[in-house]
């Protein structure tokens, strides 16, 4: 499995829709911890995902959210 950082961004006017998209959507990311700037006014969310490829990583998100998300492949690093 590969590691992905899922970077999602939406306009403040789309915040409610971005969260509502999770209703009735089944994913291991649902209920998982994520980092968000919505409460800080920037409307960005980051998730960690393990998946075989970019498509599989984005499939862990509802379509509305995935369409506004960049899946970035990452690898662990020990800071020197």
Task: Set out the residue ranges of the language-model regions.
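Conserved, structured core segments of small domains
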Residues: 1-80
